[in-house]
């Protein structure tokens, strides 16, 4: 640390130089995050100093968190769902596994997850001492449900399905997983960190939420397709009472018990998340999602015209191709199977898609 402070002008000159080293979102096609909606940025700035870890000091901000949980719970067909605002899918998935493990006594606990699951589940298993049992995928990169039953035993504390897989944008057959969960009395966690803010706004949404009786918990991230500021996730549970098993004593705060993983929690991103939902409403979110899906279809059409076939037809706005390289200046990612992966987020507009296709064509020339 400096002995003598830095002049403000010099400081912000330094910070500006570092910010210029960051990439601009226009040419980022690999991220599941996107620039925040203007109302999100405005709301975030209003609540910069708030701390949801001590809600008695910030009752208005705490009320916004409650409202966010109600709005997302209603979207997931359970208005009185339990829940709280997390830092994102990783925290939500860890907390879901914590609940599942505490709700079922198992000598050697294990969890059953699809091969497409996010790496946060590996972290969760390491932290909680859980054996991870992996379900293979079918030809469409969805969970092979016929293999699930044989992996579940009396030590299985949780089963996971994914809505909007990170690599291929697929939705696992959650309806079937719900049936299995009920039949085998297993906690079913749905990782909808990405797809949770996509599928409900599609023309023909597939069931994946609390409308299915076997679904126990859902993770959803407003800082992805919800266009909130980072970090903004949410864990929802069928029963609010389940969170009590995570409670610890907090005698020196304005609340005496706390179930969250983080202690200090930002209220600003919660305000940002609810601001977007309230400002856009269902109609506005449908329009955003429809635009992203249409741009994804156009990208697939254009890439196939150039000779790069899709790896699979996605359920949400993630496109993958048999292609080894991207044009200079564009950032895409590669799946574990070697497919080019592009996420058609709100910042990936039609103009961006068309320019990428032009550049892809020039690369082949």
Swiss-Prot record:
Its cofactor is pyridoxal 5'-phosphate. InterPro entries: GrpII_AminoAcid_Decarb, MfnA, PyrdxlP-dep_de-COase, PyrdxlP-dep_Trfase, PyrdxlP-dep_Trfase_major, PyrdxlP-dep_Trfase_small, Pyridoxal-P_BS. Coiled coil: none annotated. Pathway: Cofactor biosynthesis; methanofuran biosynthesis; Cofactor biosynthesis; coenzyme A biosynthesis. Gene3D superfamilies: Aspartate Aminotransferase, domain 1, Type I PLP-dependent aspartate aminotransferase-like (Major domain). One of its GO terms (molecular function) is aspartate 1-decarboxylase activity. GO terms for biological process: carboxylic acid metabolic process; coenzyme A biosynthetic process; methanofuran biosynthetic process. Pfam families: Pyridoxal_deC. Keywords: Decarboxylase, Lyase, Pyridoxal phosphate. Its EC number is 4.1.1.11, 4.1.1.25. Catalyzes the decarboxylation of L-tyrosine to produce tyramine for methanofuran biosynthesis. Can also catalyze the decarboxylation of L-aspartate to produce beta-alanine for coenzyme A (CoA) biosynthesis. PANTHER family: PTHR42735, SPHINGOSINE-1-PHOSPHATE LYASE 1. This is Probable L-tyrosine/L-aspartate decarboxylase. The lineage of its organism: Archaea, Methanobacteriati, Methanobacteriota, Stenosarchaea group, Methanomicrobia.
């Amino acid at each position: 640390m400096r002995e003598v402070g830095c002049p403000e002008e010099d400081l912000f000159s330094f910070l500006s130089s570092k910010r210029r080293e960051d990439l601009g979102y226009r040419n980022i096609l690999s991220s599941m995050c996107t620039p925040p909606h203007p109302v999100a940025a405005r709301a975030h700035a209003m609540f910069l100093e708030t701390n949801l870890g001590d809600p008695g000091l910030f009752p208005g901000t705490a009320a916004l968190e409650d409202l966010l949980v109600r709005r997302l719970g209603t979207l997931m067909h359970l208005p009185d769902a339990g829940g709280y605002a997390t830092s994102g899918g990783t925290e939500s998935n860890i907390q879901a596994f914590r609940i599942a493990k505490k709700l079922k006594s198992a000598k050697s606990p294990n969890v059953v997850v699809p091969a497409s699951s996010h790496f946060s589940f590996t972290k969760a298993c390491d932290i909680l001492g859980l054996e991870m049992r992996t379900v293979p995928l079918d030809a469409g990169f969805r969970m092979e449900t016929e293999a699930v039953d044989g992996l579940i035993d009396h030590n299985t504390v949780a089963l996971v399905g994914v809505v909007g897989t990170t690599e291929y944008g697929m939705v696992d057959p959650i309806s079937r997983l719900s049936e299995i969960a009920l039949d085998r009395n297993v906690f079913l966690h749905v990782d909808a960190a990405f797809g949770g803010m996509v599928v409900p706004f599609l023309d023909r949404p597939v069931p994946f939420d609390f409308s299915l009786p076997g679904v126990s918990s859902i993770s959803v991230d407003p800082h992805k397709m919800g266009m909130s500021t980072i970090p903004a996730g949410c864990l929802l549970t069928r029963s609010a009472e389940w969170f009590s098993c995570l409670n610890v004593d907090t005698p020196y705060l304005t609340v005496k018990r706390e179930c969250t993983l983080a202690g200090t929690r930002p209220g600003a991103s919660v305000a940002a998340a609810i601001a977007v939902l309230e400002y856009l409403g269902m109609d506005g979110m449908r329009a955003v999602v429809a635009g992203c899906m249409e741009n994804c279809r156009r990208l697939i059409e254009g890439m196939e015209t150039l000779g790069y076939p899709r790896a699979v037809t996605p359920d949400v706005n993630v496109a993958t191709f048999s292609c080894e390289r991207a044009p200079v200046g564009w950032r895409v990612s590669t799946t574990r199977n070697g497919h080019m992966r592009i996420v058609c987020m709100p910042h990936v507009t039609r103009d961006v898609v068309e320019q990428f296709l032009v550049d892809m064509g020039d690369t082949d020339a």
